[in-house]
């Protein structure tokens, strides 16, 4: 993996930091949060002071006016008329997290405004993705005169024609990219990515578009004093979808995600509370974006992957905790089944790749198999991309039909690749880095050849090397509670706002790593050398400042900062002392405790427990031993465990310590001297 150290212009950092101190109240006595945040914001493309302030402190006032979205006003007019006439409406949504959350948002909003709304979420296997003619025909026969799609429909030309023929008005709300033929002929199309739409933010997920439609409807129908409370309630659900669908957490998405996660600490919906329970997330705090992505979203997705997503809508509609817990437990069990099926299919994929050398040489990997569960092929495609760093398509054959999912790397636009083969598909859709499709099984070989040719014309071998962006080099003594608190202002993390990654040179193992569950590593690391970028003679305080994290220039301030790191947690402690966990201390207390308990060279005595996820395989053939030095790339987190909690680091990558040219020369000289000495010993005395 290639590490790329990001840079920020010092003058820009200084200017933005001054603005943050002046207008946002961000500072710090022993640790300059403003400089830290300014540097990280600039490296994320946010250099304007007003944009930085909005990023750090999102509010409801930062939401764009919904009527700016093309088609939304016409959609609100038609829904408003249906409410007035007591017409039944049908909300037609996708079966993933984004689609089900969109259904919940719009259905609830319509009902709060006095309307009648039912929903349909297709069965993944029996019905597949997108609008279907037979569902529209059944709805029309039941008296439905308005169907609203959410998170789908932007390429549903034939179903739109069926709706028109049946006398049903169709409103398409979607966020997927329209095809080359434009958009379907519907009463209204609400999609910020359609041609002619001047909505200022294009990156909303499907539930985000549904949220904007709900916002516009409530502005039309409800008392203004009730709207903000309801918007925050809907944001809880929209935030889950926004994070799960991996859209950029910038602009309006950041407002939705940040405020929605904060509101989840006050969840009152029985379904939400039961879901947080089964995911083992404390109800007394806001969940993190990581917890949403890896604990909440998979359980919601499992319903649509393994069974029917209707259970998700029922969960969020439950009125009592007993029923909510029953449904949440069902989703939890479905997620366990999904994990087992995913492992089974992934083993088949690995066997196929290891047994076919041509696949490893392919610029685009296309794998197909009979009977692979269609609910997990997208996840397994992601796993193959993570392992081999190639665009990957996984296709499940079902007789004469085939259904596939694709996932991509940073340098390859997947939807463009798929569109170059559009004649091979019966239907398709997606984004730059994810897609889905259906096709005749007979076309798979042609697809494999054409996709690989398309990729070879656009990719270089260098594109297949994974790249890890590193925000700064950091010494263990600089990992402090104050740094962690500064980083928290950047949350929630996700696409477009990645969690800050740091690197450290020459971290030393105090013991051999422990292997956990045959996959992960637990390491005990102590600080290595001060990063090489620090010039000889610099003080520790200067070293910290050189990292770009604004530590005060006095030695006492540096000691206070580092003592705070040592005393904050039993996970970060001097070798020579066992320091009890305590509440926040004064600077004087920190100095006194550090003086009593720390070794004189305290910067080199700090020890961290570190977790390295899915890295056990990398040390099986070349074991790491106590005393070995490694270069690490890592993130900084916090464990809330009442006894063992505290600051912790998670490794994103590790490498055997790279020797500098000077170290190599020194070793060569030592080796040469040793060889000469040995030579003289073996040669015996000189003749007289």
Show where each model-derived region lies.
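Hydrophobic helix-and-loop "lid/oligomerization" segment in the mid-to-C-terminal part
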Residues: 6-12, 16-25, 31-145, 166, ...
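Acidic-glycine-rich active-site phosphate/pyrophosphate-binding loop
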Residues: 80-81, 180-191, 355-356, 527-528
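Short alpha-helices
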Residues: 105, 183-223, 231-243
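Acidic, two-metal ion nucleic-acid-processing modules in DNA metabolism proteins
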Residues: 111, 116, 254-352, 386, ...
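Short beta-alpha junctions and helix-cap segments that line functional grooves
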Residues: 132-135, 151, 156-160, 173-175, ...
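Histidine/acidic-residue-rich, glycine-tolerant segments that coordinate divalent metal ions
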Residues: 150-204
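Short alpha-helical basic/polar micro-motif
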Residues: 208, 378, 382, 632
């Amino acid at each position: 993996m290639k590490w790329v150290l990001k840079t920020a212009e010092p003058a820009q950092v200084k200017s933005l930091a001054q603005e943050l101190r002046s207008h946002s109240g961000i500072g710090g006595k022993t640790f300059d949060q403003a400089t830290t945040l300014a540097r990280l914001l600039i490296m994320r493309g946010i250099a304007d002071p007003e944009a930085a302030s909005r990023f750090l402190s999102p509010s409801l006032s930062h939401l764009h006016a919904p009527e700016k979205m093309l088609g939304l006003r016409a959609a609100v007019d038609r829904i408003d008329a249906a409410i007035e006439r007591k017409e039944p409406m049908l909300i037609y949504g996708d079966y993933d997290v984004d689609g089900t959350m969109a259904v919940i948002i719009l259905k609830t909003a319509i009902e709060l405004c006095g309307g009648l709304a039912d929903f349909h979420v297709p069965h993944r296997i029996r019905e597949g993705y997108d609008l279907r003619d037979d569902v529209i025909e059944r709805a029309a026969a039941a008296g439905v005169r308005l169907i609203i799609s959410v998170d789908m429909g932007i390429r549903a030309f034939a179903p739109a024609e069926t709706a028109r023929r049946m006398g049903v008005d169709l409103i398409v709300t979607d966020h997927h990219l329209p095809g080359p033929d434009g958009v379907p002929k519907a009463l209204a199309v609400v999609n910020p990515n359609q041609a002619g739409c001047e909505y200022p933010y294009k990156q909303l997920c499907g539930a985000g578009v549904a949220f904007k439609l709900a916002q516009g409807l409530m502005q039309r129908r409800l008392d203004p004093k009730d709207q903000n409370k309801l918007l925050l309630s809907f944001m809880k659900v929209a935030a889950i979808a926004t994070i799960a669908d991996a859209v950029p957490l910038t602009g309006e998405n950041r407002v939705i995600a940040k405020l929605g996660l904060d509101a989840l600490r006050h969840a009152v919906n029985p379904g939400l509370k039961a879901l947080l329970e089964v995911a083992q997330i404390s109800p007394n705090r806001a969940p993190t974006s990581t917890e949403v992505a890896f604990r909440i979203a998979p359980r919601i997705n499992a319903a649509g992957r393994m069974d029917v997503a209707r259970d998700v809508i029922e969960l969020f509609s439950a009125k009592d905790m007993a029923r909510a817990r029953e449904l949440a437990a069902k989703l939890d069990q479905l997620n366990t089944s999904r994990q087992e099926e995913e492992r089974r299919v992934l083993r088949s994929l690995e066997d196929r790749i290891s047994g076919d050398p041509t696949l490893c040489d392919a610029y685009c990997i296309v794998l197909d198999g009979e009977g692979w569960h269609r609910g997990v092929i997208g996840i397994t495609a992601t796993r193959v991309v993570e392992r081999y760093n190639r665009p990957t398509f996984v296709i499940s054959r079902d007789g004469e039909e085939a259904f596939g999912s694709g996932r991509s790397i940073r340098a390859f636009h997947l939807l463009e690749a798929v569109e170059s083969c559009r004649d091979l598909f019966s239907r398709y859709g997606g984004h730059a880095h994810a897609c889905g499709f259906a096709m005749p099984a007979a076309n798979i070989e042609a697809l494999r050849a054409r996709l690989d040719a398309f990729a070879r014309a656009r990719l270089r071998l260098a594109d297949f090397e994974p790249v890890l962006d590193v925000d700064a080099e950091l010494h263990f003594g600089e990992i402090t509670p104050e740094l962690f608190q500064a980083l928290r202002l950047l949350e929630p993390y996700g696409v477009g706002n990645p969690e800050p990654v740091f690197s450290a040179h020459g971290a030393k193992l105090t013991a051999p790593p422990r292997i956990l569950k045959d996959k992960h590593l637990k390491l005990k690391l102590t600080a290595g050398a001060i990063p090489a970028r620090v010039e000889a003679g610099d003080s520790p305080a200067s070293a910290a400042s050189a990292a770009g994290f604004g530590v005060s220039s006095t030695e006492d301030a540096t000691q206070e900062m580092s003592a705070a790191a040592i005393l904050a947690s039993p996970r970060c402690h001097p070798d020579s002392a066992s320091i009890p966990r305590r509440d926040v201390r004064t600077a004087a207390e920190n100095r006194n405790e550090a003086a009593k308990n720390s070794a004189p060279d305290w910067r080199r005595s700090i020890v961290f427990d570190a977790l390295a996820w899915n890295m056990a395989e990398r040390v099986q053939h070349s074991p790491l031993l106590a005393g070995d030095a490694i270069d690490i790339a890592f993130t900084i987190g916090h464990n809330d465990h009442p006894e063992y909690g505290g600051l912790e680091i998670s490794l994103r990558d590790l490498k055997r310590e790279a020797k500098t040219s000077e170290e190599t020369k020194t070793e060569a000289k030592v080796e040469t001297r040793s060889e000469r000495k040995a030579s003289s010993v073996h040669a015996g005395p000189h003749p007289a």
